[in-house]
Amino acid sequence: FGRVGGGIYTKAADVGADLVGKVEAGIPEDDPRNPAVIADNVGDNVGDVAGMGADLFGSFAESSCASLVVASVSKELNAKWGYMMFPLLVSAGGILSSFITSFFATSVPGLKVTEEKHVERNLSIQLYISTIMSTISTVIVSYFFLPEKFCVVVSEVAKNGTWCQGYASKWAACVCVVCGLWAGLLIGKITDYMTSYNYSPVQEVSKSCETGAATNIIFGLALGYKSVVIPIFALAITIYVSFRYVNMYGVALAALGMLSTLSTSLTIDAYGPITDNAGGIAEMTGLSANVRVKTDALDAAGNTTAAIGKGFAIGSAALVSLALFGAFVTRSHISGVDLLEPITFAGLVVGAMLPY
């Protein structure tokens, strides 16, 4: 509700403020004489900060619950408290990694922002650092807090988890988390490439404006359709690999892995509305034009980072929905569901992408 309601409110206020201010009244953007400006700034906080945070944290909680529910049917994972808590330890490692990543942004000399063009680069580097450190923490947690072999497929007859039809190793579970981690990074980078002014897709859309609004709309729509191809394949491969080796527990772990860098990705996502509001405050308080130029440069980078956050939210939601479904089926000991074949679901996701 926060995402949808807040998003509609944001865009309605934004478009309304621009139409009334720029087109009808002839006053600049974020001018204090336009009351809709306040609604626009508040809407950014509701839709892009509170709404996105609620969405991602909801997916995070759901993936944690799904992995714990699926793990509860395994006798080996129930043998020790540490084995059962493996999903939560993966999340804890991600939080610690994101905390350490924040020091790279503020304390490492080579990563400090000295020019406008470095803003977007430094934000992207933080995603890389967070993903690498989360990968290392996942390997360590897998080594110490998982048994060498554990049951992942329990037969329909033995509901107490004693009759096992499939086993997985600790390193297979580790691979599932790492696949989710790097699939999330890939989705973020593809989103960055497709929405950043530093790369050719956005530059081509900008150039198409020379021939009119119709061409611009067609170019933008085509770019949006084309941008889903690689993220869909990343999700499909992650689902297939995770399910193939660790069954539904692997899918839940992959979703958890994608969300383990949540602290960093949500911080980067909130950067956009914060800089947008900073520009609005600079305009309303009558600060110098030089200040507005700087906030506009930061806002341009913030628009890209906001798109990266949306990619994370959509990708993680796809994995979490399958993980929750798998948790229900696993706990209910339902075995006759054809959708539970990894190649079937991966093909379903890829097939849904083909019309675009």
Which residues does each predicted region cover?
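Hydrophobic packing and interface segments
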Residues: F1-Y356
